[in-house]
Amino acid sequence: MTDVFISHAASETNLAYFLKRHLETEGHSAYVAALDVKPGEVWMPAILENLKSSQWVLCLASRNACASPWVMQEMGAAIGSNKKLVPIVWDQSPDELPAWMRQYQAVELGHDEATARAAIGRIADLIKVDKQKGLLILGLLGLGLALFGGK
């Protein structure tokens, strides 16, 4: 299962890779189609499977991405699957996002690497807390089954 699906415009693969690399150093698995679809793989099912298996969808919500039919299709699938969606902006303000996307709290990367790293760190921390909650719930369910199943 992928922790994070990163949606981006084709022209922003380098930024998607930067985000992926930093999330992975924080212990999260991240999927970027431009980097992770293998040669010869049928790409559309691979992308949709990774989107469906992720808990979080980070959209590099640039002007190019907001105009991309592919990115908008991925966002529709994310919303339809109740994913935790985070728009990430840097070349426009959150107020300039499409109306439907403005309802999600955006994260601004800023215009320098230190600010971007700090923003990604905040996102990574949220994902970590979310994963820990999921593990706690699974543990409690397992304990409940063990206690009540043994009677």
Region locations from a protein language model:
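Conserved beta-strand/loop subsegment of P-loop NTPase cores
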Residues: L85-V89
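Conserved N-terminal substructure of TIR/SEFIR domains
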Residues: M1-W56, K83, L136-K151
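Conserved TIR/SEFIR loop-to-helix hotspot centered on a Trp-containing motif
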Residues: R63-K83
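C-terminal helix of von Willebrand factor
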Residues: H111-V129
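Short glycine-/small-residue-rich Rossmann-like dinucleotide-binding loops
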Residues: A10, S62-R63
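Glycine-rich, charge-decorated loop segments at or immediately adjacent to ligand/cofactor-binding or catalytic sites
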Residues: S93-Y104
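Redox-cofactor binding/interface segments in oxidoreductases and associated redox assembly factors
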Residues: C59
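Generic recognition of short, well-ordered alpha-helical segments
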Residues: Y17-F18, V42-P45, P69-Q73, A99-M101, ...
